[in-house]
Curated annotation (Swiss-Prot):
This protein binds to the 23S rRNA, and is important in its secondary structure. It is located near the subunit interface in the base of the L7/L12 stalk, and near the tRNA binding site of the peptidyltransferase center. It comes from Pyrococcus horikoshii (strain ATCC 700860 / DSM 12428 / JCM 9974 / NBRC 100139 / OT-3). NCBIfam families: PRK05518.1, uL6_arch. GO terms for biological process: cytoplasmic translation. Part of the 50S ribosomal subunit. This is Large ribosomal subunit protein uL6. It comes from the Archaea. Belongs to the universal ribosomal protein uL6 family. InterPro entries: Ribosomal_uL6-like, Ribosomal_uL6-like_a/b-dom_sf, Ribosomal_uL6_a/b-dom, Ribosomal_uL6_arc, Ribosomal_uL6_CS2. One of its GO terms (cellular component) is cytosolic large ribosomal subunit. Keywords: Ribonucleoprotein, Ribosomal protein, RNA-binding, rRNA-binding. GO terms for molecular function: rRNA binding; structural constituent of ribosome.
Length: 184
């Protein structure tokens, strides 16, 4: 099997975005804010050159190639986050007991889920905003991981176990990620 001498992936830095790399910390600044992430793998070099972010590895093995391309995807997501942002839409679904959802500090409070007296809580990660409009919840942020995890926390807070999901369909469900509808 032929072996490549190196792998080099390049990412164009769009106008209005500033990328800096220092001690494996990649910092991306843009019109919506700033995202920082530590990207380390032995032998992988990340640097900025001629308006591009370059990810480089000498004599890569299969795992090294996968890591380089993963780092490229992470940096692309960081650039997209500071320019466009990420949005998740969730829908509140209930059949009998009306669910009340409100944001309080860094938590989403879900009341009267299946008639329960105690409210359920979902954590909102730093840098993420949650808005409740009727039966729709909108989660927005510039960090894809934090935004997605917050949406997942809200969905998981209403997960039903030990009951037939075909009958008991109450809950909060992600219906749209980054402008693309989710099909069930």
């Amino acid at each position: 099997m032929p072996v490549d001498a190196w792998i080099r992936e390049e990412i164009e830095i769009p106008e209005g975005v500033e990328v800096s790399v220092q001690d494996y910390n990649v910092k991306v600044k843009g019109p919506k804010g700033e995202v920082e992430k530590k990207l380390f793998w032995p032998g992988v070099k990340i640097f900025v050159e001629d308006g591009k972010v370059v990810i480089y590895k000498d004599f890569p093995r299969r795992k090294d190639v996968a890591i380089v391309r993963t780092f490229k995807a992470h940096i692309n997501n960081m650039i997209k986050g500071v320019t466009e942002g990420f949005t998740y839409k969730l829908k509140v679904v209930y059949s009998h007991f009306p669910i009340t959802v409100k944001v309080q500090g860094d938590e989403v409070i879900i009341e009267n889920f299946l008639g329960e007296k105690a409210p359920r809580r979902a954590k909102i990660l730093p840098g993420v905003t949650v808005k409740v409009k009727g039966q729709e919840i909108i989660v927005e942020g510039i960090d894809k991981e934090a935004t997605g995890q917050t949406a997942a926390n809200i969905e998981q807070a209403t997960r039903i176990t030990k009951w037939d999901r075909r009958v008991f369909q109450d809950g909060i469900y992600i219906v749209e990620k980054a402008g693309k509808p989710i099909t069930f």
